[in-house]
From Swiss-Prot:
EC nos: 6.3.5.3, 3.5.1.2
PROSITE patterns: GATASE_TYPE_1
Entry's Gene Ontology molecular function annotations: ATP binding; glutaminase activity; phosphoribosylformylglycinamidine synthase activity
Record protein name field: Phosphoribosylformylglycinamidine synthase subunit PurQ
Record-annotated membrane-spanning stretches: none
Top-level division of the source organism's lineage: Bacteria
Signal peptide segment: none
Amino acid sequence: MKFAVLVFPGSNCDRDMFNAAIKSGVEAEYVDYRETSLSGFDGVLIPGGFSFGDYLRSGAMASVAPIISEVKRLAAEGKPVLGVCNGFQILTEIGLLPGALLHNDSHLFISRNEELEIVNNHTAFTNLYEQGEKVIYPVAHGEGHYYCTDEIYQQLKANNQIILKYVNNPNGSYDDIAGIVNEKGNVCGMMPHPERALETLLGTDSGVKLFEAMVKSWREQHV
């Protein structure tokens, strides 16, 4: 299995994503936003940061980058796509995930560890966790308030698309939502950073199982 780690001007978690992929036992390669092909890749990791300086709004300019059409193609083919923080914002901007990310209710940038709950462990991203398991991931965002209409929220609930919730909501997200998947279950976006949660020495290794779950799910289908 080989992951593409997208790199935009202003990305600052691409190395963490690369390391997470390698640590999970697969290949990874950085892919510049100006590229026009993701041929040969089995999945996409869209890292956090401040793509294009968050001009217009977070993820807006990245959403029209040349590589995005290929991200949509891989998603349509059922390949795994994970967007974290700014990556989540990009996924909502390009329509692969519903809703939007707004400014935190506090209007402050939040950077700290947060306790989260796995509320759906029947996805390609969470199947190595226990249902209801509590995990610790770092958060680092100013625009992490997940917002959606009541209609979309009911669809998310009906389809079990909500996978991760905050135990102590730090940003005002609708129903404490921290992470969701698309209806097909192969595209995932979350504001917390599992790629920064790989070593107990650094405070938490709760994120290891998420990347291992992605690899496990892919291998079950292709090996």
